[in-house]
């Protein structure tokens, strides 16, 4: 009988301690509650959250953050697959999800060396386009994307990773064809709207 009483008392104390620990964890404010008062706090997400493929990740984002960044679905290779064709399907899913969940959306990114539209730098024969042609294509791309998301995206990562780690210009095709002023041009184009 003494062993049963001791065991019952031990279980009761353990469950009380566990309940107190769980209760105190529930009282810890979220990152959004603590820091979101002062600035945007967020995460880069893909369409797996809006598509319901990552419910655990979606819960974390909903609870902890007040802002989301489009990880891949708003990049040029995704939303501008052909010269005269845009595909905003995935970016729109993310924008819809952000609005539905009260999250500020940041667009990423308008000009980047790594994932531009495949056709951006070459003509139909595979030759590099002229400076004027690339400036026109960059203008067209930025204007169409920014116009499409106007009022839904709070801000844009306009030019991404234009510099190497040592501070020198990245020798991207934007840089090689247009020169360093491609950065200023991209910001001017994005700012027009």
Report the location of each language-model feature.
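Short, structurally constrained coil/turn elements
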Residues: 13, 35-37, 61, 149, ...
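Substrate-binding cleft and catalytic face of glycoside hydrolase catalytic domains
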Residues: 28-29, 63, 67-81, 90-193
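Acidic-and-aromatic substrate-binding clefts and catalytic sites of carbohydrate-active enzymes
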Residues: 21-22, 44-57, 76-89, 163-168
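Short, motif-level signal for alpha-helix interfacial/capping segments enriched in acidic residues
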Residues: 13, 49, 137
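Bacterial Sec-dependent N-terminal signal peptides
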Residues: 1-24
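Boundary/entry segment of secreted carbohydrate-active catalytic domains
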Residues: 21-67, 71
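Residues at the starts of beta-strands that form the adenosine-phosphate
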Residues: 3, 40, 104
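Generic alpha-helix initiation/capping and coil-helix boundary signal
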Residues: 7-12, 36, 91, 183
């Amino acid at each position: 009988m003494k062993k049963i009483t001791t065991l019952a008392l031990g279980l009761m104390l353990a469950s009380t301690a566990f309940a107190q620990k769980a209760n105190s964890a529930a009282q810890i404010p979220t990152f959004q509650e603590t820091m979101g008062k002062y600035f945007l706090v967020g995460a880069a997400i893909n369409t797996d959250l809006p598509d319901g493929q990552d419910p655990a990740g979606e819960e974390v984002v909903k609870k902890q953050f007040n802002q989301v960044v489009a990880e891949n679905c708003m990049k040029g290779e995704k939303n501008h697959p052909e010269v005269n064709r845009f595909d905003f399907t995935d970016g729109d899913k993310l924008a819809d999800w952000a609005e539905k969940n009260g999250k500020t959306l940041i667009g990423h990114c308008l000009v980047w060396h790594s994932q531009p539209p495949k056709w951006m730098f070459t003509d139909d024969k595979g030759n590099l386009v002229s400076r004027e042609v690339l400036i026109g294509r960059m203008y067209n791309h930025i204007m169409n994307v920014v116009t499409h998301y106007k009022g839904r995206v709070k801000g844009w990562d306009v030019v991404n990773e234009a510099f190497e780690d040592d501070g020198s210009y990245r020798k991207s095709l934007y840089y090689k064809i247009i020169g360093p002023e491609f950065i200023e041009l991209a910001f001017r184009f994005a700012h027009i709207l």
